[in-house]
Amino acid sequence: VLEQTSKRGISVAGILLVPPTGDAGTLLKHPDFNGIAPYTMPNMTTIESTNCYAAALDFLAERYSDPNMRIAHWIIHNEVDGGSHWTNMGDKPIATFMDTYLRSMRMCYNIAHQYDQHSEVFISFSHGWNIAAGGGWYKVRDMLDFMNQFSESEGDFFWSLACHSYPAQLGNPCTWDDEQATYSMDTEYVTLKNLEVLDKWVSLSSNKYKGTVKR
């Protein structure tokens, strides 16, 4: 498939998921993983587990930097605002979760850029902008604020947004009727109705990479 997309000039995004099972599960599974979620936050609490994760990233980054089978965009884990349901590391305060998540993202960015200076990393999130989209979930806008804070204090790097812009009510596809999706930055949800909110967010200088480049 990747050979065909490369021939046709199609840009490909890969989603980095860490299942807690398998031979590598013992090393890669976060020690506070709840045992229920389909994916785990990678374990970066020991040197051995961190090296294992870095080795996996290095293998993927080198392999898929080949122009004939290139992955240009790396989406780091799935809907991380729903860490309790998807990329799990136990029940953690948002600051603790985001500190760990950003380390995973930064590691992927640094390793991928050894092989492809034009590769990009993305934070994956659902439609809950100023509201938790599920029980025990985080608010996306709060998570992005932490991304900015950590990037500013630890050194900025270019990360981007990968939004799953579902309808406000998942069972109702009539997204144009979403009353909880407004054009305000304080909207509860970002859906197909109000994607302009994301453009507003990335256009603010305080949210740009080094204050100048849209994420």
Residue ranges and their predicted role:
Residues V1-A132, A168:
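Substrate-binding cleft and catalytic face of glycoside hydrolase catalytic domains
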